[in-house]
């Protein structure tokens, strides 16, 4: 009996020229996803990458698998049809903060509510990059952009809170340059039977450079990021001396460990 050939990262690299800006965080996410796809044990012909409109949505062109570059915000609807038509497929939605949370917000929440076995990768750079720098649904209050020259008045969405409110059964957050964590997260998303929602912090070095500087920099990341693991205490910091506990109002607060804490 012949065995399926073992896939490698190169098997998922297409022959298309990758046309993101030099230094864009999308390169790191693409590299991580290609590596993960090769390790999942799924035949290449069963992968489908579906995207909407935006910089991140060029993903299907750069992945050597089946792909569908859809219209603005409609990737969840198309992915739903694909998964229903052939449940054996491994369906991955690639979208951005504008594509999924603005024009595509309605489609996203109903995808999460239905809980089909698909995976969502939301590239969140807090800006509209493809259209040259307008504020997005995740831009912070006061953000000055081409569309908000005096600063944004709108409060940003918290994508994970939105996903949980819509009934998501798997939510996670990672960052473009932390390859080990991102790969582990994508593997866990694939293993989940239901809709997996992964928010990925991604740097747009042209129109919103440094949006996640404290998390991307290896020197400062330990003091600003906490990796959640089942059954393990919420401890972080370069010296593992900071933690999170519930306050009297059951709200999380950061505390310095040691002494009476």
Model regions: which residues?
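ATP/pyrophosphate-binding catalytic subdomain of soluble kinases
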Residues: 169-227, 231
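Active-site-proximal loop->helix
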Residues: 105-112, 130-143, 162
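Thiamine diphosphate
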Residues: 53-128
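Active-site diphosphate/adenylate-binding microenvironment
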Residues: 6, 10-71
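Short, hinge-like loop/turn segments at secondary-structure boundaries
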Residues: 66-67, 111, 136-140, 189-190, ...
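Flexible, low-complexity linker and terminal segments
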Residues: 1-6, 15, 206-261
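Conserved thiamine diphosphate
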Residues: 8, 88, 136-188
């Amino acid at each position: 009996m012949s065995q399926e050939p073992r896939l490698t990262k190169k098997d998922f690299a297409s022959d298309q020229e990758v046309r993101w800006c030099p230094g864009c965080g999308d390169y790191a996410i693409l590299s991580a996803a290609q590596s993960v796809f090769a390790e999942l044990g799924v035949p290449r012909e069963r992968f489908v990458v579906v995207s909407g409109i935006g910089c991140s949505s060029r993903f299907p062109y750069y992945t050597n698998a089946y792909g569908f570059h859809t219209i603005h915000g409609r990737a969840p609807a198309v992915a739903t049809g694909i998964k229903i038509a052939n449940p054996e497929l491994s369906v991955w939605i690639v979208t951005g903060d504008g594509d999924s949370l603005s024009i595509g917000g309605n489609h996203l929440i109903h995808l999460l509510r239905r809980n089909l076995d698909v995976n969502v990768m939301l590239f969140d750079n807090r800006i509209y990059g493809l259209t040259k720098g307008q504020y997005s649904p995740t831009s912070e209050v006061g953000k000055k952009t081409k569309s908000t020259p005096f600063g944004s008045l709108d409060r940003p969405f918290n994508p994970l809170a939105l996903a949980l409110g819509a009934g998501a059964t798997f939510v996670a957050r990672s960052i473009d340059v932390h390859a080990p964590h991102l790969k582990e997260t994508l593997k866990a998303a694939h293993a989940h039977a239901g809709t997996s929602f992964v928010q990925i912090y991604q740097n747009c070095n042209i129109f919103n450079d440094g949006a996640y500087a404290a998390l991307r920099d290896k020197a400062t990341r330990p003091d600003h990021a906490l990796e959640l693991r089942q059954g393990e205490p919420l401890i972080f910091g370069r010296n593992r001396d900071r933690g999170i506990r519930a306050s009297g109002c059951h709200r999380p607060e950061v505390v310095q460990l040691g002494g009476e804490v």
